[in-house]
Amino acid sequence: MLDTRSVIAIVDDDESICRAVKRLLRSAGMEADTFTSGQEFLDFIDAVPWVRVECIVLDMHMPGMNGLEIHERLLQMGNCPPVIFISAEDNPLASEEAFAAGAVDFLRKPVKDHVLIESLHRALKRVERSDVNS
């Protein structure tokens, strides 16, 4: 049996954002995997069951499947870790939609490094609390 590996998933169609966030998380001692589409991320979850996604940094607007659709699919699968939505869109409705869907945070791009790290720490504390309670 394989050991479980825990990661933070970064799902954004902009590869440069994926790389930058992954570097930031590594420098903060966190392990991250990147995905440039929602389908790529969902395929990964199906194919690699020994990886535990502890939190998702999820772009709200991507070609194909948008962030809200990905989040809904995860909820349907019963496998939805905390989600931090990110978006370049300057529309107050976007954050309302994200929180209504169950997001733990909504951050506007460009996201300041310390803001993302603080948001991730809060989300991961939620994961720890739910692990203790289950």
Model-derived regions: residue spans:
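C-terminal output helix
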Residues: 93, 111-121, 132
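Short amphipathic alpha-helix used as the core "switch/output" element in two-component signaling
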Residues: 43, 68-79
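Acidic catalytic/metal-coordinating carboxylates
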Residues: 36-37, 66-70
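Acidic, metal-coordinating helix/loop segments flanking the phosphotransfer/catalytic sites
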Residues: 34-55
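Two-component/phosphorelay signaling modules centered on CheY-like receiver
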Residues: 15-33
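Alpha4 helix (beta4-alpha4-beta5 surface) of REC/receiver domains from two-component response regulators
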Residues: 69, 90-105
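Active-site residues of response regulator receiver
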Residues: 58-59, 87
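Receiver (REC) domain active-site loop signature in two-component systems and cognate sites
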Residues: 62
